[in-house]
Amino acid sequence: MLRFILGLTALYLISVCAADVSAKSSKKNPTQEVQVTILSSNLANGATVGEWGLSALVEADGKCVLFDAGRHPDTVIRNAKVLNVDLTCVTDVVLSHFHFDHNTGLLPLLEDLRASNPKAIQRVHVASGFFLRRQYPQGDGFVDWNQMIDVRKKLEAAGVKIIEYNKPTEILPSIWVSGPVTRTHDEQKYGKARMLVDGKWVQDNVPDSQVLTILTDKGHIVLLGCGHSGVVNALEHVQSKIDNAPIHALMGGLHLFNASDEMLGWTADKLRNIGVQHLMAGHCTGIEPLMRLRTGLNLTRKTAVVGAVGSKFVYGEGVRPTSIAM
């Protein structure tokens, strides 16, 4: 009987350990080939066009994900054609938050891609709070401005599945969305815009602000839309909730264009301590703040550049800036 009990105990311990290893393995399954191409940002040259907006194509081990869709209806479509970037492979779109400068191009892009590939853009991934009613002050009152409430109906009518997340989730192998970011630090200031929550109007702190990260052998490749949660909060959230891996690359909008010198210094110190290895920031980051971060993080012109339209980050190679951003 004692042998039988010991045998069962051993089998139980083996099964528990195996399950634990399996869980860890499934959570961290690093991708090997990653390329990120900026399709919408403030800085552009050549035949591409710039705008106050953001969009990037993420290609990872044969998967294509579009991160945000730009401010104007045709910016992403036009820039992709100029750059010879084929977007018909896009099956998933991740939207960083509800602001129109990150999603106005989505419906026109859907129509354009479906003409060539009826299976393009099957899913749109957003964080909880994305479809809350929003208003901003105008004159003596307020006006509604979350256009995505109406856009949602059109997307669903076209057969697009919209998925909301309240926690970090792996949407494709090694590709994660953060869901709402834990805000430990008071990094961002919010104005008079408001949102309707449980029947009450409250200050809009953009709770749906989320990030996308790709797990690789060298760590996270993180994309922010505007960083309304705060870039430090976002990176700490990624490392604590998804995987405590290094931040191999950081790109997108960091919302530092109007940050004080004190805040820029604090942010640089934090990002240096976190260990950001490559930086390709644009949109609402600001040119001068990016230069401050480059210096503060001890990076160089080869590892920290403006994320202009056409700029790329290639895993295993690093940043490939356009001529205007070199």
Segments from the language model and where they lie:
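Boundary at the C-terminal end of the N-terminal hydrophobic targeting segment
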Residues: A18-A23
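Conserved beta-strand hairpin/beta-sheet module of binuclear metal-dependent hydrolase folds
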Residues: Q35-L83, N205, S209-L224
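Binuclear metal-dependent phosphoesterase catalytic core
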Residues: A80, L290-M291, R301-M326
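Cap/insert and terminal regions of metallo-dependent hydrolase folds
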Residues: D92, H99-P108, R123, K200-G310
